[in-house]
Amino acid sequence: MAAKTYNAGVKEYRQTYWTPEYTPKDTDLLACFKVTPQPGVAREEVAAAVAAESSTGTWTTVWTDLLTDLDYYKGRAYRIEDVPGDDTCFYAFVAYPIDLFEEGSIVNVLTSLVGNVFGFKALRALRLEDVRFPIAYVMTCGGPPHGIQVERDIMNKYGRPLLGCTIKPKLGLSAKNYGRAVYECLRGGLDFTKDDENVNSQPFMRWKQRFDFVQEATEKAQRETGERKGHYLNVTAPTPEEMYKRAEYAKEIGAPIIMHDYLTGGFCANTGLANWCRDNGMLLHIHRAMHAVLDRNPHHGIHFRVLTKCLRLSGGDHLHSGTVVGKLEGDRDATLGWIDIMRDDFIKEDRSRGIMFDQDFGSMPGVMPVASGGIHVWHMPALVTIFGDDSVLQFGGGTLGHPWGNAAGAAANRVALEACVEARNKGVAVEKEGKSILTEAATHSPELKIAMETWKEIKFEFDTVDKLDVAHK
């Protein structure tokens, strides 16, 4: 073995971290970055800089490099690709040895991949487009507390998507009035109701009073309908200790499901709560508040497909996924891609959906995607087609905005859903024939008829900001 020597000074990153001859190992963690360099900076140099600054490198050589096997531990920029339709940036593919990351710690992975490197001056912008977690690393993560099949067994609901509703107005209701709205929605035919992401424990409605009134409403609706019901009680709190206190109380009063804002709450808190839910038989609903700050800019940040993978590994039984057809951002093909990431055991590379790597989740349970945001009964045929059975279709204003009240809004959604599922099971092209399916169903449901009349002109026809790269469409 050749003796190591130390040569002080600064050398180009590409001398150490640009390795186009490298063949990634099955155990490597692979990352695809969309890199927008400063003018005049060579692609190979800036790709190598990303690999260096997200792994072992710093701005100068250091003598302590001699005390380790730097060639083993370093990140390696091994491939560069053009971004179709955009000559201001390029894709840089980086391989990291698995030993760089603490087992089961999404916190540690993100600290490296999206840490200081995102402030590097040689970059105008940087976006983490996708990550391939090796199966050896996946197996160190807890994943969803229960998964889709266990949830169906707990809730005793099969053969269709689940129906939910976010209680509105999201802020300002007293606990008793909040519970009343929950009861009316569940009695009307929904499976779940939900706290909104910013409902925690404010002066107008403290968490414990909300939990009590909501659970009373849930149990009353269960008795009257003979169906299992639930409400996502948001336990997101200022401290982990307070979060667990709220979770314990939810369990004590008999709630089947709690909720966490995983990005604002953080991955450390989320992984801990997922572990607690697994141990205590509680389902865990995950809201993605703050995601658009990270993922909406097509040149800088973290793509939602990465945040989806991280959540599946960290733990959650539900995750908000966008709707494609509602009021929130969401390219159809990209959304189908991260729905697959949530639910499937193995996801093949598919550039048409923005998926840059194969991803193997082994036997890890799937996460149920939640379609929520500006949807109503006219969207039901498209939602059933896009999301399939293993999903939650969540209508907030599309339930509570019904002219006849909350229970009627819930009934309209339930009738619309069951009509679409029945038609699909008969082989009808539901999305194509949606209008006729709903019109026929409305002949025996005045609630649905009024809902269709109320929202027939409501559309959210804005262009998607974060589109898939054009040549992959």
Swiss-Prot record:
Protein biosynthesis among keywords: no
Site note Transition state stabilizer, residues: K327
The record's free-text note on cofactor binding: Binds 1 Mg(2+) ion per subunit.
Enzyme class: lyase
EC number: 4.1.1.39
Residues modified as N6-carboxylysine: K194
The keyword Transcription is annotated on this UniProt entry: no
Binding site for Mg(2+): K194, D196, E197
Entry binding sites for substrate: N116, T166, K170, R288, H320, S372
Keyword vocabulary terms for this entry: Calvin cycle, Carbon dioxide fixation, Lyase, Magnesium, Metal-binding, Monooxygenase, Oxidoreductase
Active site: K168, H287
Entries under SUPFAM superfamilies matching the protein: RuBisCo, C-terminal domain, RuBisCO, large subunit, small (N-terminal) domain
Single GO molecular function: ribulose-bisphosphate carboxylase activity
Domain of life: Bacteria
GO BP of this protein: reductive pentose-phosphate cycle
Listed cofactors: Mg(2+)
UniProt xrefs under Pfam families: RuBisCO_large, RuBisCO_large_N
Catalysed reactions, semicolon-separated: 2 (2R)-3-phosphoglycerate + 2 H(+) = D-ribulose 1,5-bisphosphate + CO2 + H2O; D-ribulose 1,5-bisphosphate + O2 = 2-phosphoglycolate + (2R)-3-phosphoglycerate + 2 H(+)
Note, other: The basic functional RuBisCO is composed of a large chain homodimer in a 'head-to-tail' conformation. In form I RuBisCO this homodimer is arranged in a barrel-like tetramer with the small subunits forming a tetrameric 'cap' on each end of the 'barrel'.
Known role: RuBisCO catalyzes two reactions: the carboxylation of D-ribulose 1,5-bisphosphate, the primary event in carbon dioxide fixation, as well as the oxidative fragmentation of the pentose substrate. Both reactions occur simultaneously and in competition at the same active site.
Subunit and partners: Heterohexadecamer of 8 large chains and 8 small chains.
Family of the protein in this entry: Belongs to the RuBisCO large chain family. Type I subfamily.
Protein's recorded name: Ribulose bisphosphate carboxylase large chain
Species: Cupriavidus metallidurans (strain ATCC 43123 / DSM 2839 / NBRC 102507 / CH34) (Ralstonia metallidurans)
Gene giving rise to this polypeptide: cbbL
